[in-house]
């Protein structure tokens, strides 16, 4: 669902409108409270006060709510991510402030818990190289992805591609009995004995589809992620990689919906 910049500006054209939105978003069923003039809080007839910014990303921030909201809008409207440098330019803040805002927004994008099921494609990739070069790829990071066809994705920054690591991630994130689609990597041969069904394709032999068996969905996600990291962020440290993986997983899992509203529901 497309949420345009014109709609955004009309809805959040002032600090008061932004604050009112946060209050209603966090306390939708609350009645009997009124806005305290000149303060960022609400109170009832008994004098009990509610501070809607408390325990949110906005608490104790010197950045205006309008700038925060606009930053969240930019993240929701972009397919390729938003760099701290771009936020600095758009918001007119320091680079340090822009980086912190971007970091906090990605924290809102952490992946939900819950098991994938049905037809699930499973694959791994390296940031900055290909698996054939794995032995030469010092300082490269591995990511594992599991995606339901026409459903959700779970993607994790993993320490290695050992059998135990991959099998553990499958057990933690995919419901038993699901149909898995993988490549020929040896670890996946073990899943049939663990309550999963499996079909595979031989990427090493240039086989990318065998009837219903393919990993094209997860490969498409990798392609988008790598293009975005390279084009928008240029490079991502291993320390912060999971937060960027979360960012693109969040967009994928909320495709077709209003990402801005989904993000604001997590503040």
Question: Where are the predicted features?
Answer:
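Residue-level recognition of single "structural anchor" positions
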Residues: 1-267
């Amino acid at each position: 669902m497309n949420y345009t910049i014109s709609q955004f500006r009309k809805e959040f054209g002032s600090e008061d409108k932004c604050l009112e939105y946060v209050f209603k978003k966090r306390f939708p069923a609350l009645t009997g409270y009124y806005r305290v003039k000149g303060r960022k809080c609400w109170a009832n007839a008994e004098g009990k006060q509610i501070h809607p910014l408390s325990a949110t990303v906005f608490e104790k921030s010197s950045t205006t709510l309008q700038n925060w909201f606009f930053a969240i809008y930019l993240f929701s409207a972009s397919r390729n991510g938003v760099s701290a440098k771009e936020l600095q330019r758009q918001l007119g803040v320091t680079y340090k402030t822009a980086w912190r805002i971007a970091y906090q927004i990605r924290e809102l994008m952490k992946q939900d818990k819950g098991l994938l099921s049905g037809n699930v494609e499973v694959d791994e990739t390296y940031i900055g190289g290909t698996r054939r070069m794995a032995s030469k790829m010092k300082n490269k990071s591995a990511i594992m992805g599991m995606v339901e066809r026409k459903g959700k994705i779970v993607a994790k920054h993993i320490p290695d591609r050992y059998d135990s690591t991959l099998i553990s991630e499958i057990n933690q994130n995919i419901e038993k009995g699901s149909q898995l689609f993988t490549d020929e990597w040896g670890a996946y041969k073990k899943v049939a004995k663990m309550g999963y069904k499996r079909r595979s394709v031989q990427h090493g032999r240039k086989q990318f589809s065998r009837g219903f068996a393919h990993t094209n969905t997860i490969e498409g996600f990798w392609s988008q992620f790598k293009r975005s990291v390279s084009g928008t962020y240029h490079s991502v440290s291993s320390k912060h990689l999971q937060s960027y993986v979360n960012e693109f997983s969040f967009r994928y899992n909320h495709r077709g919906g209003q990402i801005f509203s989904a993000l604001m529901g997590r503040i």
